[in-house]
Amino acid sequence: MNIHEYQGKDILRKFGVSVPKGIVAFSPAEARQAAEQLFEEQESNVVVVKAQIHAGGRGKAGGVKLAQSPEEAYEIAGQILGATLVTHQTGPEGKEVRRLLVEEGMNIEKEFYVGITLDRATSNNVLMVSTEGGMEIEKVAEETPDKILKIQIDPLHGLLGFQARQAAFFLELDGERFKNGVKFITALYNAYVSIDASLAEINPLVVTAEGRVLALDAKINFDSNALYRHKDFLELRDTGEEDPFEVEASKSNLNYVRLDGNVGCMVNGAGLAMGTMDMIQLAGGKPANFLDVGGTASPETVTEGFKIIMSDKNVKAILVNIFGGIVRCDRVAAGVIEAAKKVGLNLPVIVRLEGTNAEAAQTMLDESGLNLISANGLRDAAEKINEALAG
């Protein structure tokens, strides 16, 4: 689960992570009021008005601007709120701005990158720091990997003091800045572990002319499997920032990811789903989604899956590819038949069922009287997808 920058900063602040003063605003009037309050409390003569969307690259898209007065903050807020920002992370459709963060200005001396996430190759959390703050870390890793330091964190011991100091040395901090940097990194790790985050990314981490070390931006992602321990965080979820198809799928406990293709697919098991998507591509189509109905698929979940797939107007054909291990093929077939009657399938539907009760499932489909196309194996399914798209 992702949250907004201002929400992430509120959480980090509770763990002693230094962040600038900021106030969330939902209207130009609230932005002006926030700016007035910040100008009264700070010595700086500038505030920053920042669009709050679940994507990076906001500055380049015009979503981060400086204001030197409350009235200017009001005008900027009027320009940004309701606008659609298109960044390298939003896709061409962009994201509409519905809220802003008005934040105190900083006298920035240097910018760095600090992030903590799970390294799946080593099954450890990893601390990453870079001298190239404010840039896409993926681009830095590709072009100048020597500017990134990765420190593996033993889960039994956590982040040790010498590791935090090693990171601060790599960033070439000294004096009071070094102490503040070590304190910041330690607090960030403590927050990351305590809230069961899957990512805590500060880009940029800034050092001010006064020697302060602060998170100028913050990206926090939660491990969804641990949210039962942090039910208060569920209130931070902004479904308006998520794909509506994915939100609807989550209500039925379906693992769904929307793509930009023309062949909808319903599969059980992530590995088979990815293989099916490859096969669709090889057949000349393009997958419109990743949809894993899981091992406990029922007629109801299959019906919901079809409803979601059919809601995507780009879908021209549907492939159902099920291997009956835990899930029985006849239960899936019942769901396909029920969905066809409820939803009114008006697209070619290719069905390939193998495994437990596959023969019974095939009989159910044949006797249903519905226009369903049966496939024997992946090659046959690929050919029939090609025919369906060509027709």
Swiss-Prot record:
Alphabetically sorted, this entry's keywords are: ATP-binding, Ligase, Magnesium, Metal-binding, Nucleotide-binding, Tricarboxylic acid cycle
Which GO cellular component does the record give, naming just one?
succinate-CoA ligase complex
The cofactors named for this UniProt entry are:
Mg(2+)
InterPro entries from the xrefs? ATP-grasp (IPR011761), ATP-grasp_succ-CoA_synth-type (IPR013650), ATP_grasp_subdomain_1 (IPR013815), Succ-CoA_synthase_bsu_CS (IPR017866), SUCC_ACL_C (IPR005811), Succ_CoA_ligase-like_bsu (IPR005809), Succinyl-CoA_synth-like (IPR016102)
Q: Which GO terms describe its biological process?
A: succinyl-CoA metabolic process; tricarboxylic acid cycle
Which residues are listed for substrate binding in this entry?
N268, G325, I326, V327
ATP-grasp domain sequence ranges: 9-248
Cofactor details (free text)? Binds 1 Mg(2+) ion per subunit.
**Record-linked PANTHER family:** SUCCINATE--COA LIGASE [GDP-FORMING] SUBUNIT BETA, MITOCHONDRIAL, SUCCINYL-COA SYNTHETASE BETA CHAIN
Which family does the entry's similarity section mention? Answer: Belongs to the succinate/malate CoA ligase beta subunit family.
Q: What does this protein do?
A: Succinyl-CoA synthetase functions in the citric acid cycle (TCA), coupling the hydrolysis of succinyl-CoA to the synthesis of either ATP or GTP and thus represents the only step of substrate-level phosphorylation in the TCA. The beta subunit provides nucleotide specificity of the enzyme and binds the substrate succinate, while the binding sites for coenzyme A and phosphate are found in the alpha subunit.
In its UniProt entry, what is this protein called?
Succinate--CoA ligase [ADP-forming] subunit beta
Organism from which the protein derives: Chlorobium phaeobacteroides (strain BS1)
